[in-house]
Curated annotation (Swiss-Prot):
Name of the protein described by the UniProt record: Aspartate--tRNA(Asp/Asn) ligase
Any one of the GO BP annotations: aspartyl-tRNA aminoacylation
Subunit structure: Homodimer.
GO cellular component: cytoplasm
Lineage: Bacteria, Pseudomonadati, Pseudomonadota, Betaproteobacteria, Burkholderiales
InterPro entries in the record: Aa-tRNA-synt_II (IPR004364), aa-tRNA-synth_II (IPR006195), aa-tRNA-synth_II/BPL/LPL (IPR045864), Asp-tRNA-ligase_1 (IPR004524), Asp-tRNA-ligase_1_N (IPR047089), Asp/Asn-tRNA-synth_IIb (IPR002312), AspRS_core (IPR047090), GAD-like_sf (IPR004115)
The organism of origin for this protein: Albidiferax ferrireducens (strain ATCC BAA-621 / DSM 15236 / T118)
Keywords in alphabetical order: Aminoacyl-tRNA synthetase, ATP-binding, Cytoplasm, Ligase, Nucleotide-binding, Protein biosynthesis
EC numbers: 6.1.1.23
Region of interest (Aspartate), ranges: 198-201
Residues the record lists as binding L-aspartate: E174, R220, H467, R508
Family to which the UniProt record says this protein belongs: Belongs to the class-II aminoacyl-tRNA synthetase family. Type 1 subfamily.
Marked site: Important for tRNA non-discrimination: H32, G83
Length: 611
């Protein structure tokens, strides 16, 4: 016989007059004039239990209850007295009059109150089991479950087959460092945990499983950020005989359906933007369209100005000069203060910028002025070093109005894109940005397409793949892979939502000769290609179908949906930013015997510093 009849949080006024049996944890116990009230909690929420002293044995047990005791309650559902209804709870119109009370397991005093919102992350992760009892975490993980179920339902309805691929595979160069697993049987050889199932899912297409998916763990040994984990969950999908447009349409429908069924959110239109346009307008390949600020291209304007910071960047190979107009940023009342501007100047240095030039637009009507006083309606130390034609062009291109502030970025294009792109987001999300309608609180999805096939690595002096080396070039671009790799555009695509890359993919190369051209462009020799990817090259020769796919980061999707500050808030047992599990103390030393069996001898290990 089941130990309970209902979940605590699902007991409502539809059960009035019925006897229920509940199991859960004591959230709070209150003694009011001889009557004890106990809030009992489970994954679905709370219900109030009333313990009356008329039942002496039961009441004695209730007197001994403390927070986090695991208990069983049997009692009668009745309406709460007038004036005590709690509209914020599903169970807020009723209470349970306790008839029987059993302590299933007492609890020691918890190291913190579960309703404490100011806990450090170290405390939360060290005591993760208790942290997971908090409604915030329970709601996050329940949403994660529902999203995964909706994804499975959609894919199943569209003919996709869930197929597992190996966790122990071959180490291949895919960008990040592999997590290696030593082989006991094959001395000196290692498996690698998968960074993605990329090659196996392509092999499944060759094998004839034309619609594949799995929700799987992937592993990357890389430096961690707020949106990264060494192990993460991927919704991995591949399909044959669909065009790039077909693939994007199908999985746009999937994400739209998931948001509607789980959050009742209509995502609306997904604008499609080329990579080059995204970088030109926002300095990012995952722009946050909620922020109503855009770059203004000024490189061509600044080639002959006396201000060397601008002219140097404008004339250097790979340099860029942009403006970022902040409407209302120079107003005397409600504009950005000198302290805020100085803080932004320090902020962009994080991204390699040397400083942050600006012009305050006070009164355009005063015009360019004269030699004695140039541009009297503008306020900036750089105006004197920029000729009138350039200043007029800056004002025209940016659409500047009285009270506006124009920030400038001038350096190598990557530094400008990173620094001014980050500044755009920071200002947009600031209180100033929200008060001045520079930020729109909404869901803004989009597709970014037409990525370059390759980018040049200055340090290694060779081209690297922007997505991965199995991405197909656009039709007509194959020959450029050899003659002009920098011109070659791929059939890659990313789905972006509110500045986060939710998922990305591409049409794949399905011909061995084209795949070899990519390896040639990447300076991967035929011998290395055969050693690393011979199994794929061989498979492509057996009538491989046209195919493509994508992968969504489940952790990121849930982070976006919940508004969590960290991806660690949507994973049951995450790692810290130092790739440690504070709950289990992993990684940890292992027994010398285990190392000998694996043919491993350690250098003297350094102790792990505390997180």
């Amino acid at each position: 016989m089941a130990m309970r009849s209902h979940y605590c949080g699902l007991v409502t006024d539809t059960l009035l007059g019925q006897t229920v049996t509940l199991c859960g944890w004591v959230n709070r116990r209150r003694d009011h004039g001889g009557v004890i009230f106990v809030d009992i909690r489970d994954r679905e929420g709370y219900v109030q239990v009333v313990c009356d002293p008329d039942r002496a044995d039961m009441f004695k047990v209730a007197e001994g209850l403390r927070n986090e005791f695991c208990i069983q309650v049997k009692g009668l559902v009745r309406a709460r007295p007038e004036g005590t209804v709690n509209e914020g709870l599903k169970s807020g119109k009723i209470e349970v009059l306790c008839h029987e009370l059993t302590v299933l397991n007492p609890s020691v005093t918890p190291p913190f109150q579960l309703d404490d919102d100011n806990l450090s992350e170290t405390t939360r992760l060290t005591h993760r089991v208790l942290d997971l009892r908090r409604p915030y975490m329970q709601n996050n993980l329940m949403l994660r479950y529902r999203v995964a179920m909706e994804v499975r339902k959609f894919l199943d309805a569209n003919g996709f087959v869930d197929i597992e691929t190996p966790m122990l595979g071959k180490s291949t160069p895919e960008g990040a460092r592999d997590y290696l697993v030593p082989s006991r049987v094959h001395e000196g050889h290692f498996f690698a945990l998968p960074q993605s199932p990329q090659l196996f899912k392509q092999l499944l297409m060759v094998a004839g499983f034309d619609r594949y998916y799995q929700i799987t763990k992937c592993f990357r040994d890389e430096d961690l950020r707020a949106d990264r984990q060494p192990e993460f969950t991927q919704i991995d999908i591949e399909t044959s005989f669909l065009s790039e447009q077909d693939i994007r349409d199908l999985f746009q429908e999937m994400i739209t359906t998931v948001f509607k069924t789980t959050l009742n959110v209509d995502l609306g239109e997904f604008p499609v933007m080329a990579y080059s346009e995204a970088m030109h307008r926002y300095g990012s390949d995952k722009p946050d369209l909620r922020v109503k600020l855009e770059f203004t291209e000024l490189t061509d304007v600044m080639t002959d100005v006396d201000f060397k910071v601008f002219s140097g960047a404008a004339t250097m190979k790979g340099g860029r000069v942009v403006g970022l107009r902040i409407p209302g940023g120079a107003r005397e009342v409600g504009g950005l203060s000198r302290g805020e501007i100085d803080a932004y100047a320090e902020f962009v240095k994080i991204y390699g910028a040397k400083g942050l030039a600006y012009i305050k637009v006070n009164e355009l009507a005063k015009g360019p002025g004269d030699k004695a006083l140039r541009w009297p309606g503008l306020q900036s130390p750089i105006v004197k070093n920029i000729h009138d034609k350039a200043i007029a062009e800056v004002l025209a291109r940016t659409g500047a109005q009285d009270g506006d502030l124009i920030f400038f970025g001038a350096d190598k294009a990557k530094i400008v894109n990173d620094a001014i792109g980050a500044l755009r987001i920071k200002i947009g999300h600031s209180e100033f940005g929200k008060k001045n309608a520079l930020f729109e609180k909404s869901w803004r999805p989009m597709w970014v397409v037409d990525f370059p096939m390759f980018e040049f690595d200055e340090e290694a002096q060779r081209y690297t793949a922007v997505h991965h080396p199995f991405t197909a070039p656009k039709e007509g671009h194959e020959d450029w892979m050899v003659t002009a790799p920098e011109k070659c555009i791929s059939q890659g695509y990313d789905m972006v939502l509110n500045g986060w890359e939710m998922g990305g993919g591409s049409v794949r190369i399905h011909r061995a000769d084209v795949q070899q051209k990519v390896f040639d462009a990447l300076k991967i020799s035929p011998e290395e290609a055969q050693d690393k990817f011979g199994f794929l090259l061989d498979a492509l020769q057996y009538g491989a179908p046209p195919h493509g796919g994508l992968a969504f980061g489940l952790d990121r999707i849930i982070t976006l949906m919940t508004g969590a500050e960290s991806i660690r808030d949507v994973i049951a047992f995450p790692k810290t930013q130092r790739a440690q599990c504070l709950l289990t103390q992993a990684p940890s030393p292992v027994d010398e015997k285990q190392l000998r069996e694996l043919h491993i001898r350690l250098r003297t290990p350094e102790p792990i510093k505390a997180a």
